[in-house]
């Protein structure tokens, strides 16, 4: 049975790339919405997907020079990005003088399992 999950992470005055959400073991996640909002400053914001099966990181979203004074944001709706167990969403601000909130909405459901009987 699937359930809706929203992961939220706010990064303030820090440009280090950090983990935002890890798909739990024996689950899959289907991303439907990505929302990135600047509440202070004027910097780039990046969202990444780390594929644990191939140990490869992919860029998912990039918001260039979001200005909090103008209420700028990036909204990607009606997506279908499938993640597998232990995949990781990561976020990174481009500088150290901003506050950016990242929100990702997804459906989380148990992974299909195959059993073999002798």
Outline where the language-model segments fall.
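C-terminal interaction-tip segments
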Residues: 1-29, 37-40, 51, 93-118
